[in-house]
Swiss-Prot record:
Catalytic residue list: 144 (proton acceptor)
Cited PANTHER family: O-ACYLTRANSFERASE (WSD1-LIKE) FAMILY PROTEIN, WAX ESTER SYNTHASE_DIACYLGLYCEROL ACYLTRANSFERASE 2
Protein name: Wax ester synthase/diacylglycerol acyltransferase 2
Family: In the N-terminal section; belongs to the long-chain O-acyltransferase family.
Tissue expression notes: Mostly expressed in flowers and siliques and barely in roots and stems.
The encoding gene: WSD2
Stretches assigned to the Cytoplasmic side: 1-182
Subcellular location: Cell membrane; Endoplasmic reticulum membrane
């Protein structure tokens, strides 16, 4: 196959959300770090991308945001693409003293490096660097205008195959569905579902509107700087056992997501309380327990909520849409210290159940679309900055493959994803892969100068839950 490929498709308009994510001050990117169990081979990756990734029109087109006489007419323009220009192999000393720290610095510096808008907005950096968890590392960077995290992860996983079966796509754990015992039970359950849906939707939508109109997070210790998106970022990740989380999940009869959000909230609470203990008066420490902090959690709005491979997503008649198709919910964060670490998980479950049983994600998506249609791009930008600039963190949990996969012949050890260019000073993305969970934390170091300590506190919360979980199961069995 030739190195250069001529794309003949006609120009395509840019969606409102793609334009939003390319505006100055809202230039949002996704970074995916792939740890490999084998040494990286650039030529293999280049050849693989030629046969997969660039077949998607978004990845072989230039984004024109509108300028000069064509101002306002944003569009995708198909172009010739030289894949080698998008696969970067930096010269790295193989005997570098601290490879893990080098990887953190490298990915962090990518957040400050602008992308060349004259080329398709994606790139792969192949680091021939042996770290604690990988023999080599590939770091992919995608502009958010190409699609939301679900779309981009699907596209990336479409480039992979099962290690045990090189022709098979990755598989994912399917969510369990409750089966009704009889028609009457099914009817009652359906009616109860509708009642709960209407109630929770009204409550959560009203809360969301009140927050947009009046509220804002008040802790300078963890808030991003207003309007700032490109600042001194730091990206770190840790790998923990999925079984440890499932142990707590089973002990409390909750979901993995409940446990993850609970441990994040526990770690964040301890972190912020420690910061206040060191830097403020006792009166301020009391006020910390009452301040209103909020997180943003994204929901996939596609009918099929599992990550799909690109072949299924792009197939004719697929129920899964391509592009930015996500909603968000606003989650209150309790900073009051709890004597019982499980209380954080209980709070997380109560909050998340209300969100999951409401239409708030659809409302938030619809609000952004209506704002765009009525007030235009400037109004949409103002609303987005109002919402995301007044919240403390972004939290996301992505379900990954349940079996080991290979990326163009490179066996994958882990996958860590994150987003940068957002106003929040804290971005936590948790990605599952086989029997692992990868916690990826992105911070603004001017606001959170010690992200490793924050990550330690989050993982320590899980250890505390694990230590107490067997006793909790024993107590429950006796009761």
């Amino acid at each position: 196959m030739a190195i250069e490929r001529q794309v003949t498709e006609a120009e395509e308009p840019v969606s409102p959300f793609a334009r939003l994510f390319s505006l100055p001050g809202l230039d949002v990117f996704n970074i995916v770090t792939i740890g490999c169990k084998t040494e990286g081979n650039a030529s293999t990756i280049v050849e693989g991308i030629k046969n997969t990734l660039i077949n998607h029109p978004r990845f072989s087109s230039i984004l024109v945001t509108g300028h000069g006489e064509h101002k306002g007419k944003a569009r995708w323009i198909p172009t010739k693409i030289n894949v080698e220009e998008h696969v970067i192999v930096p010269d790295i000393d193989p005997n570098i003293e601290n490879p893990d720290e080098f990887l953190e610095d490298y990915t962090s510096n990518m957040a400050l490096s602008p992308m060349d808008m004259s080329k398709p907005l994606w790139e792969f950096h192949l680091l021939k660097l042996k770290t604690s968890h990988a023999e080599a590392v590939t770091v992919a960077r995608f502009h958010h205008s190409l699609g939301d995290g679900m779309s981009l992860m699907s596209l990336l996983l479409a480039c992979t195959r099962k290690t045990c079966d090189p022709e098979a796509f990755p598989t994912f754990v399917a969510p369990k569905k409750n089966k009704a015992k009889n028609v009457c039970f099914s009817l009652v359950a359906w009616l109860w579902f509708i009642v709960r849906l209407m109630f929770h939707t009204c409550v959560e939508v009203i809360k969301s509107i009140v927050f947009i109109c009046r509220a804002s997070d008040t802790s300078a210790h963890i808030m991003g700087k207003p309007g700032a998106t490109l600042s001194a970022n730091k990206f770190i990740h840790r790998i923990i056992s999925l079984d440890d989380v499932k142990m707590v999940k089973n002990a409390m009869n909750m979901t993995v997501n409940d446990v993850l959000f609970g441990m994040v909230q526990a770690g964040l609470s301890r972190y912020l309380n420690q910061r206040y203990d060191l830097e403020t008066s006792s009166k301020s420490r009391k006020n910390l327990h009452n301040i209103g902090l909020h997180g943003v959690v994204f929901f996939n709005l596609r009918p099929n909520r599992n990550i799909e491979d690109l072949a299924k997503m792009m197939a004719k008649g697929s129920k899964c849409r391509w592009g930015n198709s996500i909603g968000y919910v606003l989650i209150p964060l309790g900073m009051k210290p709890q004597d019982d670490v499980f209380e954080y998980v209980r709070q997380a479950k109560t909050i998340m159940d209300g969100k999951k049983h409401s239409l708030e994600p659809l409302f938030s998506y619809g609000l952004l679309k209506v704002t765009m249609e009525v007030f235009g791009l400037r109004g949409l930008k103002t609303l987005v900055k109002r919402i995301f600039g007044s919240t403390t963190m972004i939290f996301s949990n992505v379900v990954g493959p349940d079996e080991e996969i290979s990326f163009f012949g490179h066996r994958i050890a882990y996958i860590a994803a994150s987003t940068f260019g957002v106003p929040q000073a804290l971005n936590i993305c948790i990605q599952s892969y086989v029997d692992k969970l990868i916690i990826n934390i992105g911070v603004d170091v001017d606001v959170i100068p010690d992200p490793h300590h924050l990550c330690d506190l989050i993982i320590e919360a899980l250890r505390m839950m694990n230590s107490a979980a067997p006793k909790k199961v024993f107590h429950a069995s006796k009761v």
